[in-house]
Amino acid sequence: VNAGELRCLIGPNGAGKTTMMDIITGKTRPDTGTCWFGASINLLQMSEPEIAQAGIGRKFQKPTVFEHHSVFENLELSMAGPKGVWRTLRARLDADQRQRIEDVLELIGLQDESQRQAGALSHGQKQWLEIGMLLMQNPLLLLVDEPAAGMTHQEMDRTVELLTSLAGDHSVVVVEHDMDFVRALSSRVTVLHQGSVLAEGNMDQVQNDPKVVEVYLGE
């Protein structure tokens, strides 16, 4: 995956998509092989926190936000570092920190919901908030797991816009089963099967690949 690229990852259940993200983020250690971030960072020699600090952020399928805190506070907590929840919320934000939060709120489309409790947001809004929480940590690479699951069509369209806007400033890898959503992202697509790359290309190339039709899209 190139710097600033948006890449979609598809494949049947058990193809290795989640395992790949687990290895990249340090949650799972492979028995053999290598895993490099850029040309010089060996992820297999790093802990999960070290990998996050190196610039890799992951958004799981189910949103994990602080439901009893406001949208603004969720973003504030995401840049807490070692201070902890209560010390962070009691501390004064400087002008740069406040502007950073405002910028992310605008990017994820929640500027009008900033004082709303996160638990009161729609499913799609929670997904956007969690992406915003990752952005507060200035990641170089974002791993996004099935963002379209459970979304309305309107939320899916907005999510396509959001993920597309992130490419360039960040590398973004999206794991997704919804082929209409993948097509809307207009990105390069990698197909995994049994832990290996089966095919790569744009959506038309992948959909017309006989191997892909046989093991995945023809199901």
What kind of feature is each model-predicted range?
Residues 10-12:
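The feature captures the beta-strand-to-loop junction immediately N-terminal to the Walker
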Residues 142-146:
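Catalytic Walker B motif of ABC-type/P-loop ATPase nucleotide-binding domains
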Residues 44-45, 104-120, 125:
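Conserved ABC nucleotide-binding domain
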Residues 88-113, 140, 161:
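Conserved ABC ATPase "signature" region
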Residues 34-54:
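ABC ATPase NBD Q-loop/coupling interface
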